[in-house]
């Protein structure tokens, strides 16, 4: 018996990005093997994306839907208002390279920066996910 509640399997929804059965998904059901895009120590299993206690955290299902629809493995995904890092975790689960920025970073892989002036060269991202406060 698993030590964590079973999450529904990941699947693309045909009609909406905003339908999600839980705040987070089980990354063991995410597509793709481990890759250099995944952070050190990543392994499939009972971990969450981002921090469920972070105020305003975007459901990882929503980010997963967007990245599955509009990006490919190896793409660079930028989140200029990264919060607890949910976008970075979902990007890693899907073999995308995540770059996260926030005024008040909550972890080491998020760079402190103002979304109005990110320290990135022009045209360096394949997709930008932002869920402003």
Report each predicted region and the residues it spans:
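Class I S-adenosyl-L-methionine-dependent methyltransferase catalytic core
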Residues: 1-133
């Amino acid at each position: 018996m698993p030590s964590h509640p079973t999450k529904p399997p990941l699947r693309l929804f045909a009609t909406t990005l905003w339908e999600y059965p839980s705040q987070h998904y089980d990354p063991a059901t995410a597509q793709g093997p481990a890759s250099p895009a995944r952070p050190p120590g990543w392994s499939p299993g009972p971990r969450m994306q981002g921090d469920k206690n972070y105020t305003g955290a975007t459901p990882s299902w929503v980010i997963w839907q967007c990245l599955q629809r509009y990006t490919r493995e190896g793409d660079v995904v930028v989140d200029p208002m990264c919060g607890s890092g949910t976008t970075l975790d979902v990007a890693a689960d899907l073999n995308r390279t995540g770059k996260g920025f926030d005024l008040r970073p909550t972890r080491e892989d998020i760079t402190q920066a103002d979304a109005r002036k990110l320290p990135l060269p022009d045209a360096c991202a394949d997709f930008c996910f932002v869920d402003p406060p």
